[in-house]
Amino acid sequence: MAVPFRRTSKTKKRLRRTHFKLQVPGMVECPNCGEMKLSHRVCKACGSYKGKDVKSN
């Protein structure tokens, strides 16, 4: 099996790990009911999306 030719330096290791971070979801206020919801998703509180009632309660 192949083995690494050189040891990975601290800088290279840290540069690689800069992308291993948590991402904050894009939260927006629902224009229909005012609850916070994920953008481009149906509102869980009222079931509306783009001004239309998608989820019948």
Swiss-Prot record:
Assigned keywords, A-Z: Ribonucleoprotein, Ribosomal protein
Source superkingdom: Bacteria
Record's keyword annotation contains Ribonucleoprotein: yes
One Gene Ontology molecular-function label: structural constituent of ribosome
GO cellular component: large ribosomal subunit
GO biological process, one term: translation
Family: Belongs to the bacterial ribosomal protein bL32 family.
NCBIfam families linked: rpmF_bact
Protein name: Large ribosomal subunit protein bL32
Species per Swiss-Prot/TrEMBL record: Bacillus licheniformis (strain ATCC 14580 / DSM 13 / JCM 2505 / CCUG 7422 / NBRC 12200 / NCIMB 9375 / NCTC 10341 / NRRL NRS-1264 / Gibson 46)
